[in-house]
């Protein structure tokens, strides 16, 4: 039942839609919350209001709150606790509120996996699993999966049924090479994963072959997938139609090729008819249409005709492009007859059946293997929970008694990030919610425009169905609420985002209509200054190479060009960052609500992937700008990791020549190339390891060389490692290798040493994690690492810069989701989308299952079957829709400045292609074919921006501008501005050096290379030092002190007056430690001292009790000497002082005798103002003074000579910092209870 929403008070800050989302109830509710609209705050406040409501409040454990991450769940739980505590303060007598606070830790606020885990733990007795199960880690699951799928294939090969074996071989021949059957293992594993997002995986699997078992009367139009091919054909026909339309327009120009006009009209009508058939006709009609397409010959243009030759050529070029598109469509889809296409589908049914059978066997054996080990994985959690929540009735799944109990328990089910759920998760949610959509208790929050996890099998169509069906007002279905007020970004960022996505995002291409309900509305409190969004297009010089030359490049050349793009874009970003920092750019601080200077940590660089991360990090390092890159790549390519992995490979099997050679060349063995060659020559016909042993035997019999000694040490350690590998743990072996080789210390001394050591620690930690699984052994671990590398599951190198430091951040767009940054660079906008999944001979889909290429096993020919073609078109449309959403996430991360950076090969050609969009009616979005063929973000943004008024400075044609409040700064930048060619620079220097005529330049260069640095002495000084260090250095220069002032008259000691004072001798603590203890006592002792020695002793004991002194220190404090201090003249003045400051730390800048500035730190023992207003500097000394010299007049001179520098610096610090005059500088010598005046 729909309930009335309370009236919003005038003094609340919620928008009307937010208020509605917080209080709406009585039916399922979908909140479509755009970026920056405060959806998390709305969700949390809805929970809070449900619990603290005065009318019909619910208990906090009657809410089921499902979040996407554990961090989100923890934040919600914390904010709920804070809200309850605040409510209790306002209503301290409420027993309900106090009870909620005690229930908060029992509340089901978690990820869906955690909720499923709770169900499985509680009801494990309903399943055939060990109640003491544990969640397996990814490494263990991966290893087990690899073993099981290999066993399944091995078992299939060994089958006694000939028909089954033949079916297996046909399957293998269809999808693998002659080398191995790894592709079949991958195919089985991926098909298994796809099946697991369905509530009934086995039923879904067995439906796949049926889709290929077509009845005779079936036509292609009966196949749902054929719609996607027709849509693609239509897009191509529309593109050809635009080209012919442009050709026709050219023929009608005054100086255009008029003789072409008749042909253009024929072509125009022909393609128009094709578009009609693609929309309304059958497949057979389309086939017949392409079979009859004929291109007539263009009429000859008379030489005497007044025709612009360039227009004539342009008309030809447009027509040829249209013909190319049409011919490609025919060759791709309409060469084979419809009957042939259907027959190819039927022929694939047995192969699909065999694959499904193997996947089913694998699924069961994998399940049993996990049961045997008492483990489950995350996918099992959801399926076991579903098993507990359902019972099968007449072949359909119905809620079980457990599900019915949960329906009663949970008064509301709230789901965050609903756009990222899949079909299985939706099924679980439906089983625990109450009612139907029109009277249910399911509250869903999300933004389908930010659904970017399809690769994890998320299904955004779930959100889109409800979005289109739920009404904005209560009716016979659920309620939809749109939150589009953006509290994050400046209006310039939002206007540009709206401008772009209104043109590119539609229902057929983009899966979402970006209308007024979806557009972002500015709501953040920024000032009115104009901050345009920047579009930067990097391009090579136009005269550097032709387009044809660019297209003819080899793969290696393209790779080098890609490297250049990353460098150029990095250098522009560095330059732009420097410019902003130097120009005093400010950003708005939401905490202080004021403008403040831009910091590095305000800046982020977003990229689709981290492929360029290494290049960007290197460029930023050279530029001196700190960059933090959270990369998941490059770990296994790190030199130190490769070397240790090679050591492990050789320990496992020494008969691996390349790893063994790598280990011998490593610094901890240290063989040269010549030494390796000598070993190889010992016996070139045997494996290298045998040659190595033979070399050692032969060398050992003669004069033992350095090479022999290196190898002997290595082989001794090597045999120990092999022994440990057989009987010990893997992690111990790795650490033993580190210790024996000292390699861990070696890499620490290399550049980026901390990072390299962290990489080695990660390898050790990975071994520890591996050992926690049911697997053991070095061989399996190495195989596991190899599989990780094959699958691309890199670990990412350790980082020496922390992400909380004041650094620029480089992150993927996916990692940035949910975050915000004042300044956002989106780099790599011109990089092509990743289409690697379309290169396989198979494709997966949650709706249509599996599509494979047609195989002719007899002729060994592969065809692109119609299901494969259709599913490829569907997946490409989905891929582009996902990329649009990724772009949306990237652009909406920016709070104040958004800078889009991309590279193109040829700016003039790119600009002309973008300008084609200027012919579109001004009230229409970009044509579907333009959006559907895009291969990069620039392919969407460029044509859209070309219709904007700010593009006029770049345009070569006139056009009608789109009406838009957005503001762009468009910058095509020649890469020559950022071409720092180090080799060319070196070549130029070399040329100058070898030019005999320029002797003056040569002399100047030589003089500079041999120049002596003027301030060489200053380089040996510390820029920051202590008073003690200054004192020590000055005393080292003093050579005049007489020998008899030292504690050992017969032997001169270093720089101290004596090794120890009398009261410090025969103690376990050092003199420094006991001197510190005395200073501690003097720091805390009362100003008026004590009347008795026992009182001083009690005071010291109290310091020990308070742990300000250790027991050992308390025992050696000279109690009597401390007592006597207060009975000396200086002690009496201390007792009568007006102010006292003790243990006063300071830091000052001072200039030394060479004129160099130094930062000096120190701690002043005591500073007091006596009863006459004089400031006295008092310093305590515990140096030992020999008795027969204690009263010598020379002692004063000696003591002050030693400590004058210290007292002078202390005095300078006091006068500089406190702005007071030091009247006296006094040393108090505890050893002989004497005062020495400076």
Swiss-Prot record:
User: Which Gene Ontology molecular-function terms are recorded?
Assistant: 3'-5' DNA helicase activity; 3'-5' exonuclease activity; ATP binding; ATP hydrolysis activity; double-stranded DNA binding
Q: Which GO terms describe its biological process?
A: double-strand break repair via homologous recombination
Name the EC number(s). Answer: 3.1.-.-, 5.6.2.4
User: What are the protein's UniProt keywords?
Assistant: ATP-binding, DNA damage, DNA repair, DNA-binding, Exonuclease, Helicase, Hydrolase, Isomerase, Nuclease, Nucleotide-binding
| Cysteine pairings via disulfide bonds | none
Instruction: Provide the cofactor list for this protein.
Output: Mg(2+)
As recorded in UniProt, coiled-coil segments are none
Gene Ontology cellular component list: cytosol; DNA helicase complex
The UvrD-like helicase ATP-binding domain extends over 12-490
Per the record, what are the reactions this protein catalyses? Couples ATP hydrolysis with the unwinding of duplex DNA by translocating in the 3'-5' direction; ATP + H2O = ADP + phosphate + H(+)
- Positions that bind ATP: 33-40
Start and end residues of each UvrD-like helicase C-terminal domain: 510-818
Q: Return the Pfam families for the record.
A: PDDEXK_1, UvrD-helicase, UvrD_C
* PROSITE patterns the UniProt entry points to: UVRD_HELICASE_ATP_BIND (PS51198), UVRD_HELICASE_CTER (PS51217)
This molecule's function is given as: The heterodimer acts as both an ATP-dependent DNA helicase and an ATP-dependent, dual-direction single-stranded exonuclease. Recognizes the chi site generating a DNA molecule suitable for the initiation of homologous recombination. The AddA nuclease domain is required for chi fragment generation; this subunit has the helicase and 3' -> 5' nuclease activities.
The record's comment on protein family reads: Belongs to the helicase family. AddA subfamily.
Q: What PANTHER family would the database entry show?
A: ATP-DEPENDENT HELICASE_NUCLEASE SUBUNIT A, UVRD / RECB / PCRA DNA HELICASE FAMILY MEMBER
| NCBIfam families associated with the record | addA_Gpos
Oligomer status and interactors: Heterodimer of AddA and AddB/RexB.
Q: What is this protein called?
A: ATP-dependent helicase/nuclease subunit A
Which species does this protein come from? Lysinibacillus sphaericus (strain C3-41)
* Recorded name of the encoding gene: addA
């Amino acid at each position: 039942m729909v309930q009335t929403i309370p009236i919003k008070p005038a003094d609340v800050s919620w928008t009307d839609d937010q208020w509605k989302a917080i209080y709406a109830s009585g039916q399922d509710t979908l909140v479509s919350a755009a970026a920056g609209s405060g959806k998390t705050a709305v969700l949390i406040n809805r929970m809070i209001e449900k619990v603290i409501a005065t009318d019909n409040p619910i208990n906090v454990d009657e809410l089921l709150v499902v979040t996407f991450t554990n961090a989100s769940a923890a934040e919600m739980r914390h904010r709920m606790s804070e809200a309850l505590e605040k409510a209790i303060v306002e209503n301290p007598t409420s027993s309900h509120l106090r009870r909620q606070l005690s229930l908060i830790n029992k509340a089901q606020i978690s990820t869906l996996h955690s909720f499923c885990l709770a169900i499985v733990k509680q009801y494990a007795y309903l399943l055939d699993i060990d109640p003491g199960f544990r969640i397996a880690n990814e490494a263990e699951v991966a290893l087990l999966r690899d073993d099981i799928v290999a066993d399944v294939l091995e078992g299939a090969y060994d089958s006694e049924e000939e028909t089954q074996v033949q079916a297996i071989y046909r399957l293998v021949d269809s999808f693998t090479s002659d080398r191995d059957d790894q592709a079949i293992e991958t195919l089985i594993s991926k098909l298994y994963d796809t099946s697991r997002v369905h509530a009934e995986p086995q039923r879904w699997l067995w439906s796949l072959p049926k889709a290929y078992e077509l009845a005779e009367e079936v036509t292609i139009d009966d196949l749902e997938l054929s719609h996607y091919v027709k849509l693609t054909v239509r897009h191509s026909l529309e593109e050809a139609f635009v080209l012919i339309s442009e050709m026709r327009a050219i023929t009608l120009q005054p100086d255009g090729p008029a003789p072409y006009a008749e042909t253009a009209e024929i072509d125009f009508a022909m393609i128009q008819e094709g578009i009609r058939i693609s929309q309304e006709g059958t497949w057979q009609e389309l086939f017949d249409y392409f079979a009859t397409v004929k291109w007539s010959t263009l009429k000859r243009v008379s030489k005497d005709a007044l025709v612009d030759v360039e227009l004539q050529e342009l008309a030809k070029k447009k027509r040829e492009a249209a013909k190319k598109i049409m011919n490609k469509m025919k060759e791709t889809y309409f060469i084979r007859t419809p009957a042939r296409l259907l027959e190819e589908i039927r022929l694939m049914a047995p192969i699909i059946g065999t694959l499904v059978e193997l996947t089913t066997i694998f699924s069961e054996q994998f399940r049993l293997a996990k049961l045997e080990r008492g483990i489950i994985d995350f996918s099992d959690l959801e399926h076991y929970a579903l098993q507990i929540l359902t019972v099968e009735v007449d072949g359909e799944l119905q809620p079980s008694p457990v599900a019915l109990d949960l329906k009663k328990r949970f008064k509301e089910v709230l789901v965050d990030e609903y756009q990222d759920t899949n079909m299985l998760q939706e099924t679980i949610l439906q089983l625990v919610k109450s009612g139907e959509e029109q009277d249910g208790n399911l509250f869903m929050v999300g933004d389908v425009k930010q659904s970017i996890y399809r690769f994890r099998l998320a299904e955004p169509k779930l959100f889109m169905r409800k979005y289109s069906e739920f009404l904005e007002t209560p009716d016979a279905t659920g309620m939809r609420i749109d939150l589009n007020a953006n509290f994050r970004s400046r209006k310039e960022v939002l206007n540009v985002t709206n401008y772009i996505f209104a043109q590119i995002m539609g229902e057929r291409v983009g899966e979402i209509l970006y209308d007024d309900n979806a557009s972002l509305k500015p709501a953040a409190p920024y000032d009115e200054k104009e901050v345009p969004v920047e579009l930067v297009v990097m391009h090579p010089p136009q005269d550097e190479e032709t387009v044809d030359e660019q297209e003819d490049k080899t793969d290696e050349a393209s790779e080098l060009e890609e490297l250049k793009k990353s460098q150029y874009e990095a250098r522009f970003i560095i330059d732009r960052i420097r410019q902003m920092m130097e120009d005093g750019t400010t950003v708005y601080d939401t905490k202080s609500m004021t403008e403040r200077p831009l910091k590095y940590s305000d800046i982020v660089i977003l990229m689709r992937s981290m492929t360029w991360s290494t290049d960007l990090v290197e460029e930023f390092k050279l530029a001196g700008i700190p960059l933090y890159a959270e990369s998941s790549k490059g770990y296994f390519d790190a030199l130190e990791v490769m070397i240790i992995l090679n050591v492990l490979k050789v320990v496992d099997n020494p008969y691996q020549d390349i790893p063994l050679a790598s280990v011998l060349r490593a610094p901890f063995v240290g063989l040269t190339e010549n030494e390796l060659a000598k070993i190889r020559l010992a016996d070139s016909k045997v494996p290298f390891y045998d040659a190595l042993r033979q070399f050692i035997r032969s060398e050992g019999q003669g004069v033992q060389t350095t090479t022999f000694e290196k190898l002997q040490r290595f082989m001794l350690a090597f045999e120990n490692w092999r022994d440990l590998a057989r009987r010990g743990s893997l992690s111990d072996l790795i650490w033993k290798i580190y210790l024996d080789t000292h390699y861990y210390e070696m890499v620490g001394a290399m550049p980026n040493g901390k990072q390299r050591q962290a990489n080695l620690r990660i390898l050790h930690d990975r071994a520890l994690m591996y050992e926690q699984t049911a697997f053991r052994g070095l061989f399996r671990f190495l195989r596991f690492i190899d599989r990780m590398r094959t699958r691309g599951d890199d670990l990412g190198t350790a980082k020496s810069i922390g992400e909380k430091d004041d650094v620029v951040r480089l992150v993927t767009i996916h990692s940035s989701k949910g975050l915000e940054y004042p300044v956002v660079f989106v780099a790599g906008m011109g990089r092509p989308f990743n289409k690697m999944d379309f290169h396989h001979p198979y494709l997966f889909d949650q709706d249509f299952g599996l599509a494979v290429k047609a195989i002719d096993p007899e002729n060994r020919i592969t065809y692109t079957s119609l299901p494969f073609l259709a599913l490829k078109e569907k997946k490409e449309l989905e891929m582009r829709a996902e990329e649009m959403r990724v772009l949306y996430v990237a652009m909406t991360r920016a709070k104040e400045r958004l800078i889009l950076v991309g590279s193109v090969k040829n700016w003039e050609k790119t600009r002309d292609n973008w300008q084609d969009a200027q012919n579109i009616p001004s009230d229409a979005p970009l044509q579907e074919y333009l959006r559907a063929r895009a291969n990069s973000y620039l392919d969407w943004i460029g044509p859209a921006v070309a219709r904007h008024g700010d593009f006029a400075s770049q345009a070569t044609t006139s056009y009608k501008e789109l009406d838009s409040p957005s503001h762009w700064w468009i910058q095509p930048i020649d890469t020559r501005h950022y071409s720092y060619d180090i080799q060319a620079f070196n070549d130029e220097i070399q040329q100058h050096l070898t030019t005999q005529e320029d002797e003056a330049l040569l002399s100047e260069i030589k003089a500079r290379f041999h120049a002596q640095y003027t301030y060489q002495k200053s380089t040996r000084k510390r820029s920051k030092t202590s008073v003690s260090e200054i004192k020590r250095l000055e005393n080292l220069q003093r050579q005049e002190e007489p020998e008899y002032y030292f504690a050992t008259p017969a032997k001169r000691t270093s720089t101290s007056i004596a090794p120890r004072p009398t009261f410090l001798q025969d103690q376990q603590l050092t003199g420094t430690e006991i001197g510190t203890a005395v200073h501690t006592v003097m720091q805390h002792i009362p100003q008026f001292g004590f009347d008795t020695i026992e009182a001083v002793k009690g005071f010291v004991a109290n310091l020990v009790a308070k742990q300000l002194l250790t027991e050992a220190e308390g025992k050696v404090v000279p109690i009597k000497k401390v007592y006597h201090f207060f009975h000396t003249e200086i002690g009496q003045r201390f007792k009568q002082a007006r102010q006292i400051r003790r243990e006063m730390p300071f830091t000052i800048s001072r200039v030394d005798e060479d004129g160099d500035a130094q930062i000096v730190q120190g701690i002043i023992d005591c500073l007091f103002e006596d009863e006459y207003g004089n400031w006295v500097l008092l310093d305590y000394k515990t140096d030992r003074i020999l008795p027969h010299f204690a009263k010598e007049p020379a002692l004063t001179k000696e003591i002050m000579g030693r400590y004058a520098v210290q007292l002078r610096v202390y005095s300078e610090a006091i006068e500089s910092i406190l702005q007071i005059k030091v009247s006296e500088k006094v040393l108090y010598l505890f050893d002989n209870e004497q005062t020495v005046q400076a």
